[in-house]
Amino acid sequence: MEFAKIGNSQMGLLVSGAVLFTVVPLIIAIVWTVKKKEKFTSILVGAACFILFALILEKPLQNILVFPTLMGLGDHAAAGFINARPVLWALILGLFPGVFEETGRLVAFKTVLRNRKNRETGISYGIGHGGIEVILTMGITYITYIAYAAMINSGTFGNMIAQVAAQAPEQEANGYALAAQLAAFSAGDMVIGVAERIFAVMFHTGASILVFYACRDKKKFWLYPLAILLHTVMDSVAGLQMAGVIALSPVMLEVVVAVFGSAVFFGGYFLLYKKDAGKEQV
């Protein structure tokens, strides 16, 4: 099959996106640490915990349960049961990041960051967690898209799709959809992606504030399961969209992310962080 060529305007947007999603998170991290005189290691811990709990632990286990063929495994009864039930499928896709990522925060604040009681620690962790997610999920994705676009223009993309289809037949259609998406990529698509990441980082920062105070004050430990619940619900909405249970426009889906991200961030910021001014232990 011959794919539509990727134009110069699309390539320019992809390159701009790759730079934006890799450089800006680093700038935010540096500005925050300098302005607040925070230890950069708190940000690094947030980034490291995202890599450990989300990428190394969560994703492989989720794939083994729901998408075994992506792991080179044979299909199994549990995967068939889950994939035949869209609502359950969406719930599991939301529950895994909710449990693993919020538990990652808990472990970090209870161990390597246990002696850092200043209120900025929660935000520093969130910047690290959210920032590395932007770099790895968007920055690297845009770099990959640039490579795919070059393959499409050189006529070698079809060979890659054939190789993917041989190992995971259900992913073949995604390859064709991606090629069409790249050919039609617009500035509006990038704006939506930027907005989604902004609100996602706000969510991660707010959730980090919640779990930080859950660890610092035993009476507020309920904030930890609350963070899991909020994370699960937000990601499950995206899962319901992917499963076809609901049909939201891209803009409406971003509105959902915006509502969750804003509510969690501003709730944590004003109800916990701001009220703690001058009270934190040094």
Feature locations, PLM:
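Hydrophobic alpha-helical segments at protein termini of multi-pass membrane proteins
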Residues: 1-282
